[in-house]
From Swiss-Prot:
Job description of the protein: E3 UFM1-protein ligase that mediates ufmylation of target proteins.
Residue pairs linked by disulfide bridges in the UniProt entry: none
GO CC terms of this entry: endoplasmic reticulum membrane
Signal peptide start-end: none
Natural source organism: Drosophila persimilis
Bilayer-crossing regions: none
BP terms from Gene Ontology: protein K69-linked ufmylation; regulation of proteasomal ubiquitin-dependent protein catabolic process; response to endoplasmic reticulum stress
Keywords tagged on the record: Transferase, Ubl conjugation pathway
Any matching Pfam family: UFL1_C
Highest classification ranks of the organism: Eukaryota, Metazoa, Ecdysozoa, Arthropoda, Hexapoda
Disordered as annotated region, ranges: 404-482
Full protein name: E3 UFM1-protein ligase 1 homolog
Enzyme class of the recorded protein, top EC level: transferase
GO MF annotations, alphabetized: UFM1 ligase activity
Its EC number(s): 2.3.2.-
C-alpha cells in the first residue's frame, strides 16, 4: 500500500510538472502581425494604435496607463500632455477620460484635465492656508491662481470642504467671497477704533484708506458695530457724521434760534449741513417757519412782532420802518420778501399798506399826505382849459381816430389795386421787360401827414398812446396814427407839495417814489376835471376845434401844392395817374375832415368817421343849405384837376368861416428838406426790398429835381425812368438790376430756388442802393460825367 501511494504521488508530480511545463514556440514578427490582423478583421480583438502606427495597445490597458499618468501627476493631468506622453491620438485619450470620469465619481474632467479627489483635497488645504493668512479670499482670485473654472472651485472645492478642510464662512451678501471669523473680528476692531476717534464729518473713502478695510465689509459690519454716529449713504461720496458733531450742530442751531427767532441758511451751511431748509424742518418739527430766500423766520417773530406792528400801523394811520423790528442782518431784499409773504397770508389785506424801501405806509397816511395834490390837479385842469391845451388834445385824438379808419380803407383799396394789376399781367402774359414797362409792387403805406403831436385827452385817456406825426413819403409807412397822453400833473409838482411833510419824518428820499405812485391817479383826476370844464364850455371848445381843423386843412393844401410841382415833371399820362392818386389820398382826407366838421356844426350824428363818396354826399344833403352845395361840389372835384379841387375846397372853407393862409414860398425849401430827411430815416430802418427801392426812388427824385412826390409803389418804374438821365450808367444799371430782382421775388413762389437766390442778391445790393440814395447830390452828376 505504501508503494502504491508513493507511485500515485510520483504520477501526480509528473502530471503537475506536465501541466506547469509550457511549450513555447517563437513566432516571427510577420506571423504576429498576421495573427493580430486576422483577429481585428474578425472583431475578436480591439486595439489602439500609437500615433506612429508601430505599436498598439488595448483600450483597457490604455485606460490603466491614463490612470497611472493621473497618479504620477499628483491627481491633475492635462489630457494634451497625456496624449503626448503615451503617443496616442488625443481623441482616444479624451474618450477614455470621459469614461473614467463617468465611471469613477472621485475623478472629474474639467476643461481638458482629469482631477481626482486627492488633488481637490490638496488645493482645499492650500486655500485654507491662504484664507488663514489673508483672512478673506474670493473665488475670482482662486480661479486666477489655480487656473480652474470659478464654478468648479466654488461648488466642488470650497463649498464642499467649507467647515471641514477650509476653516471659514461664506459672505451672505456675496457668495463668491469667503473669510475667517478672526478676519471679521479684526475688521470690526479697526472700524470701531477708527469711528471712535473721529470727531467731525469724514469721507468714508478716507476712513477705509486708513484702516485698509473694503467698503462692502465696512457697510455690512457697520450695523453690528452700532457706532456713535451715522453714515449719510452707501454711495461713493458718503460721509460718516459722529453723534458728537451732530449734537454740536444741533446745540448751535437751537441756541441761535432761541436768541434770534430766525436762522440764516449760509450760517447753517457753514456747519457742514448742505440742505438747510430740510435740516430746520427736521430739527424743529413742531415749529412753524417762514422760509425766505436767505433766512427762515420763526412764527413767533412774524406773528408777535411784524404782524402786530403792521396792525398797529394800520390802526394808527401811520407808517412802520421794518428795519427797526426785524434783525439787523436782514437785507432790504429779505425785508421786502418778509412783507410780501405776510401780505400773501389769508388774514392780511395788502390794499391797506404800501411798501417803499423797507418802509410800510398805511393807506390813510398816504391819502392824507397827497391830499393837497388834488387841489393842484384841479388847478392844472382849469389852466389846460384856459390855455386851450386840452381842447387841442381832444382835436388831435379825434383826427387820429379818423386817420386810422381812413388808413384801413386805403389799405383795402391798395389790395384791390394789386389784384387788378395781377389780373392785367395774367391776361397780357408779360412779366416785364425794359425800363418803360416795369411796375414795382410795395406794401400799402401811410398817407402823407405833417403836424406836431399835441397834448390831448378826454374821459377815455387811458386808451391813448404815443403819436408820431411825420411827413411820410407817398405810401412810405404803414403805422397807424396815435396820440401822446396828456400829463396835466407833473412828478416834480407832487414832490414839491409832499416833501415838507416827509422831511419832518426824515423820509424825504421817498418823495419821488410816492409821487410816481400817485401820478397816474392825480392825472386821471385832473383830466376828469378838465373834461367836466370842457363840456361846460361848448362855445370855447367849438372855437378851438374850428382853429385846429383850419390849420390841418391849410397844412394839407400846402402839401398838395408841393406835390403838384413834382408830378408836373412827368409825362401827361403818368401825370394824370399821379393827380388821381394824390386826390384819392390827401384830397379824400380834406373832404372827410370838412364833412365831419360841418356835421358837428349841424348837430348830425356820424357813427363812422371814415367816409366814402356816397356817405359824404348823403351827409351833405342832410346838412344846412349854406354848406350843402359847397360840399357836393367838393366831392365832385375829387375826379377833376387839382385846381378844381382847390377852388371847391376854398368854397367849403368860406362856408365854414375858415381862411386859407397865404403861400409862403420861403418855407417850401425847409419843408422839402424836412420831407427828404424823414424819407432817409425810413430808408435806414427799412429791410423789405420793394419798399426800400420805393423810398430810394423818391429820395433820388427829390435830390435831383428839388421837388417832393406823392406816389405809390406802382410808379417806381416811371420815377426810375425820369431820373435815369441824371445818374451814371453803373448807377442806373444797379437800380435796374435791383428793380428786376424785386419783380422776380414778387412773381415767384416764396420757397422756390429762384426766389431764394433773388433774395440773396437783394441783400448783397441793399447797402449799395441805400448808400446811393443817402449820399447822392446834384454835384455828383457832373463828377460822374
Amino acid at each position: 500500500m505504501g508503494s502504491d501511494w508513493d507511485e500515485i504521488k510520483r504520477l501526480a508530480a509528473d502530471f503537475q510538472k506536465a501541466q506547469l511545463t509550457s511549450t513555447l514556440q517563437k513566432l516571427s514578427e510577420r506571423n504576429c502581425v498576421e495573427i493580430v490582423t486576422l483577429l481585428l478583421e474578425k472583431q475578436l480583438l480591439e486595439v489602439v494604435f500609437t500615433n506612429d502606427g508601430k505599436e498598439y495597445i488595448t483600450p483597457d490597458h490604455l485606460e490603466r496607463e491614463i490612470q497611472d499618468e493621473l497618479y504620477a501627476n499628483g491627481g491633475r493631468a492635462n489630457l494634451v500632455e497625456v496624449s503626448r506622453t503615451l503617443n496616442v491620438d488625443l481623441s482616444r485619450i479624451v474618450a477614455l477620460a470621459e469614461r473614467i470620469a463617468a465611471e469613477n465619481p472621485l475623478v472629474h474632467l474639467v476643461l481638458g484635465q482629469l482631477i481626482d479627489e486627492d488633488y481637490i483635497s490638496h488645493i482645499a488645504q492650500e486655500i485654507n492656508e491662504k484664507l488663514a493668512l489673508r483672512g478673506e479670499i474670493s473665488i475670482s482670485d482662486l480661479a486666477s491662481q489655480f487656473d480652474l473654472p470659478s464654478e468648479f472651485l466654488q461648488q466642488d472645492v470650497v463649498e464642499k470642504h467649507l467647515g471641514k478642510i477650509i476653516k471659514g464662512r461664506q459672505d451672505a451678501t456675496n457668495p463668491r467671497v469667503f473669510f475667517t471669523q478672526a478676519y471679521i473680528q479684526r475688521c470690526k476692531a479697526k472700524i470701531r477704533g477708527a469711528l471712535a476717534a473721529i470727531t467731525r464729518p469724514t469721507n468714508v473713502a478716507v476712513i477705509l484708506q486708513q484702516i485698509n478695510v473694503q467698503e462692502k465689509i465696512f457697510h455690512s459690519l457697520l450695523d453690528e458695530i452700532s457706532p456713535a454716529g451715522q453714515v449719510t449713504s452707501k454711495l461713493a461720496n458718503a460721509q460718516y457724521v459722529p453723534h458728537i458733531y451732530a449734537k454740536t450742530q444741533a446745540d448751535w442751531v437751537n441756541s441761535f434760534y432761541k436768541q434770534n427767532s430766525f436762522l440764516e441758511y449760509d450760517a447753517i451751511n457753514k456747519l457742514g449741513i448742505s440742505d438747510a431748509k430740510s435740516y430746520i424742518r427736521k430739527q424743529f418739527p413742531n415749529e412753524e417757519f417762514l422760509f425766505l430766500k436767505r433766512v427762515a423766520l420763526g412764527a413767533r417773530l412774524v406773528e408777535l412782532t411784524v404782524v402786530t406792528a403792521l396792525n398797529e400801523c394800520s390802526a394808527t394811520k401811520q407808517y412802520l420802518d421794518l428795519t427797526t423790528i426785524l434783525p439787523s442782518n436782514l437785507s432790504e431784499e429779505d425785508i421786502e420778501e418778509v412783507f410780501s409773504a405776510i401780505m400773501a397770508q389769508k388774514h392780511s389785506n395788502p390794499s391797506n399798506f404800501v411798501y417803499l424801501d423797507s418802509i410800510v405806509f398805511s393807506q390813510p397816511y398816504l391819502t392824507e399826505l397827497v391830499q393837497p395834490c388834488h387841489a393842484l390837479a384841479e388847478a392844472q385842469a382849469k389852466a389846460a382849459i384856459d390855455s386851450g391845451v386840452y381842447q387841442q388834445f381832444i382835436v388831435e385824438k379825434t383826427l387820429a381816430q379818423k386817420g386810422n379808419a381812413s388808413f384801413q380803407d386805403q389799405d383795402d383799396d391798395g389790395k384791390l389795386d394789386k389784384r387788378d394789376e395781377r389780373r392785367k399781367k395774367a391776361s397780357s402774359g408779360k412779366a416785364g421787360g425794359g425800363a418803360q414797362g416795369r411796375e414795382t409792387k410795395t406794401k400799402s403805406t401811410k398817407k402823407h401827414q405833417r403836424r406836431s403831436a399835441a397834448a390831448q385827452n378826454d374821459s377815455d385817456v387811458e386808451d391813448d398812446v404815443q403819436h408820431q406825426g411825420s411827413r411820410g413819403a407817398g405810401g412810405g409807412g404803414g403805422n397807424k396814427k396815435t396820440v401822446k397822453p396828456l400829463d396835466l400833473v407833473k412828478t416834480a409838482d407832487i414832490e414839491k407839495l409832499i416833501n415838507a411833510s416827509l422831511q419832518e419824518e426824515g423820509l424825504e428820499h421817498l418823495a419821488p417814489s410816492i409821487a410816481a405812485l400817485y401820478l397816474n391817479q392825480l392825472n386821471q383826476a385832473a383830466l376828469a376835471k378838465a373834461q367836466e370844464l370842457y363840456e361846460a364850455t361848448p362855445q370855447t371848445n367849438r372855437r378851438q376845434t374850428h382853429a385846429a381843423i383850419q390849420d390841418r386843412i391849410n397844412t394839407l393844401l400846402i402839401d398838395i401844392r408841393l406835390y403838384e410841382k413834382g408830378l408836373k415833371l412827368f409825362s401827361h399820362d403818368t401825370q394824370t395817374q399821379l393827380v388821381k392818386y394824390l386826390l384819392k389820398s390827401l384830397g379824400n382826407d380834406i373832404c372827410n375832415e370838412l364833412s365831419l366838421y360841418v356835421a358837428s356844426e349841424c348837430n348830425l350824428t356820424v357813427k363812422n368817421t371814415s367816409l366814402n363818396v356816397d356817405q359824404r354826399i348823403k351827409l351833405a344833403q342832410e346838412c344846412d343849405a349854406e354848406y350843402r352845395s359847397a360840399l357836393l361840389e367838393q366831392n365832385k372835384a375829387l375826379n377833376k384837376s387839382i385846381d378844381d379841387f382847390e377852388l371847391a375846397t376854398e368854397s367849403v372853407l368860406k362856408a365854414c368861416s375858415m381862411i386859407i393862409k397865404k403861400v409862403d414860398k420861403k418855407k417850401d425849401r425847409l419843408l422839402i428838406a424836412d420831407h427828404k430827411n424823414k424819407l432817409q430815416q425810413q430808408l435806414l430802418d427799412c429791410q423789405e426790398p420793394a419798399l426800400l427801392l420805393h423810398l430810394a426812388a423818391l429820395i433820388l427824385f427829390t435830390t435831383i429835381s428839388g421837388c417832393i412826390l406823392h406816389a405809390s409803389g406802382k410808379f417806381v418804374s416811371a420815377i426810375l425812368q425820369h431820373i435815369r438821365g441824371s445818374l451814371s450808367d453803373p448807377q442806373n444799371d444797379m437800380l435796374l438790376r435791383y428793380h428786376d430782382l424785386v419783380l422776380q421775388v414778387l412773381q415767384t413762389a416764396p420757397e422756390s430756388d429762384d426766389s431764394k437766390m433773388a433774395h440773396e442778391q437783394l441783400q448783397i445790393m441793399q447797402s449799395k442802393v441805400v448808400e446811393l440814395a443817402q449820399n447822392y447830390t446834384r454835384a455828383s452828376v457832373s463828377k460822374a460825367d
